[in-house]
Amino acid sequence: MSDGKRIVLTADRSLMTNYRGNFLYGFIACGPYELIPEFVFDKLFCPSVETNKNTGEVKVAQCGLRRIESALLKEYQRDEIIISHPEMLEKSIGPNTTVVGINVMDPLGMAPVTTTMSPEKLSYVAMKFKKMCASVIQLKKKYGFKVVVGGNGSWELAKPDRMKIHGE
């Protein structure tokens, strides 16, 4: 078991991909979750970024996460900070973790493209955020760290009742 990094940065699984180099695949993530089986979506359209299987650290991350990491490195040591894959958070989080920062693009599926492609339905982007939240909530109960959410889609979570959907 890891003692965890002091600061853990992450994003939901729909953002931890390069969409096979085809930006149009990013739009597929805005589609209804029920349309394509999740394993097909993950394998075909949204393959995971390269990740260290021992630590959960991603090799490539969104620019916003790297900017936050860079700013934090002015005050903290490199070994205190990690950008972790959302499906491997348990490898990065532990008793030493004080904060988990989450970058979001469209966490509740309320952005224009998503509401157009998935009206009244759960989109992949929202489902991936929901899955990550379930993991973060369980780890937070165990270790008591703070959670900070930011990014282009953080406006979707501005009303307190919206996070109750995810258990916080």
Task: Please provide the spans of the model-predicted regions.
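A short, structured N-terminal alpha-helical element that caps or precedes a catalytic domain
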Residues: 1-167
